[in-house]
């Protein structure tokens, strides 16, 4: 089919004339040719070690993991995090601020979490799921991978003046709960 207006900014005129489309925008109704980038075939699954997991802002973690071997990737590359079945209580989360950024105030973000009443929240995940995260580290950093992750809270219910009774973000809650 014809390219959608939402797809056009992502391609050159030549690519559009060659029929390029975004996979997330195409409804497949007939046979089509798909080109898969070479790096997709080199995908590996690793168990990683959490090196650090500090808050760098009220609702953002700098999550640093170490993988068992170096990975060749380009800027803008991403990894997938596998989230197992789990039950995460926000009251158990450590929101210590990054010691390099706030050396004299490790509890810098606690008051904001108190004010937003985040501590009673709970995330329950009943099945293994995967989520993609863009890497904030450089390939030259070897086996350490850094992700900047924002906590995904439930929507705010203005009538109740509290969080809606829905599950918080599965992956962000899981990542926020991880400790070295």
Model-found features: residue ranges?
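Signature of N-terminal electron-transfer/Fe-S-associated modules in redox systems
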Residues: 1-66, 83-84, 122-138, 147-148, ...
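FAD-binding FR-type
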Residues: 66-74, 78-180
């Amino acid at each position: 089919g014809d390219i959608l207006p939402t797809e056009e900014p992502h391609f050159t005129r030549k690519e559009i004339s060659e029929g390029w489309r975004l996979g997330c925008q195409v409804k497949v109704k007939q046979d089509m040719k798909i080109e898969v980038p070479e790096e997709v075939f080199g995908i590996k699954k690793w168990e990683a070690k959490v090196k650090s997991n500090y808050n760098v802002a009220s609702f953002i973690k700098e999550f640093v993991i170490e993988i068992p071997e170096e990975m060749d990737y380009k800027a803008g590359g991403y990894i997938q995090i596998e989230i197992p079945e789990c039950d995460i209580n926000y009251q158990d989360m450590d929101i210590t601020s990054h010691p390099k950024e706030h050396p004299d105030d490790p509890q810098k973000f606690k008051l904001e979490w108190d004010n937003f009443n985040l501590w009673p929240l709970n995330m329950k995940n009943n099945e293994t799921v995967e989520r993609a995260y863009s890497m904030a580290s450089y390939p030259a950093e070897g086996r350490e991978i850094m992700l900047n992750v924002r906590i995904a809270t439930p929507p705010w219910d203005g009538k109740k003046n509290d969080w809606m009774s829905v599950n918080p973000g599965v992956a962000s809650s899981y990542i926020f709960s991880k400790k070295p």
